[in-house]
Each structure stands twice: as C-alpha cells, then as structure tokens.
C-alpha cells in the first residue's frame, strides 16, 4: 500500500470514528433526556426495551459471526460480550472459570455513560440494561439454566459493571435469570488468556467499520423503540431535544474531523450532509 493510499485510509477512519462518537453521544444523551424529562421508571423501561431488542436481533447472529456458537452457553455468552464490545471500543474484560461459569467486566471509564454522564444514571436504569440483554441470553440459546449474576454496578459507586454467566443445575424462573451478589468479586483479568479475533477475517478496515457501526446500531434501535414506548408525539420531542443539545455540544469536534468549520446555517447543513455520507 502506498503512503498516499494509507494516509487517505487513515483520514477515512478518523471520519468514521467521529461519526461513531456523535452517535454514541446521542444515545447516551437520549437516555439522560428520558431520565430528566420522564423520570427513572420510564427511562428504565426504555433502556430495557432497547437492550432486549438489540439482544433479540444481534446476539445469535453475532455468535456465529464471531465463531462462538459451538462453545458452552456460559462461555459463549461471556465471550460474545467481550469480543463484540471490544470491537466497539468498549473497555471490557473476560475471565474463564469453567465451562459453566465465565465472568465479564466493564471497568471504568464506562463507554455507555461517558464522562460526567455517569453521575446522572440511576441504578435502576443500569439494571434495566442487564435485564434486557444479559438475563435473556439463556432463553435465546434455548438453555433456561443459564443466568447472569451481577456483582458490581459502576453507577452505584462500585469500580465497574461486573458479573458472571452461570449454568445452574435447574431451569431458572424469570426473576432468577438476573440476580445480584455484591459480596463477590471477579478473578484478575489476564489479557494473554482472553479470546481474540482472527486477524485474517477481521482486518483493520473491517474493524474500523464495525467500530463505527457499533454506536450507530444503538441509535437505530433506540429511535423506533422510543416511539413505541412513549408514542410519536412525546418521542418526537425527546429525540428532537436530544439531537439539538448533542448537535450544539459536538458540532466543533465533528466538523473538524469532517473537514468543516463553524459558520452559519449553510455550513451546519454541509456538516450534516458530510456526516450522513460517512454512515454508508
């Protein structure tokens, strides 16, 4: 590859990452908008439905894409969270104990609650994320013995979101698929023993595109979900307000990455069009 081609490719990837950051900020901001305008209970319901829909649409296909579908259920679920989140730029750790118990940990700084946003997220909203996705992986795999034990929540002041998948000796009832055990702690993380993506099937260009798409998928899921939960009129207000706030806060940052600058409405519109082009 020539130096010019490599430089152009790096510039393209910077644009993709800027778009990813914008979508990331919008998704986090949307949750905070619902918390502050609708309250904790409504925000928890919204987050639950977003993550349940994501889980139903992406978990099983993702297992196959990552080559994890032949692993024991607890190991497959934990490795899925490790690899899929790693691709999206999330700080994440994985620890294998045995074929029926595997840990996953999201240490600070938390990706989803970036920066000071973490101070505005109630514990109930974080639990809704786990109920929506982690608690339902056993159901998706057809193994009702698989549950998730949460040992830490960063929004509660603990040093990360942490827990383990456990395959029990009996089928679990609905309220047993997510339980809390705050007295436990994950074993130390060893990156040398963690799973890794095969380089030949996951080259740099594919990883960069997946990084961009990771944040975009949350917004693509959240938009229709918020309409279903709150109705089109209230959803329109929440989406518009969040978009305006995030747009004002992130305009300079995104414009710089996309080769634009601060200006009047025409310049703002051009940055919007440039952002749309980088989503393709």
Residue ranges and their predicted role:
Residues 129-133:
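Elongated alpha-helical scaffolds
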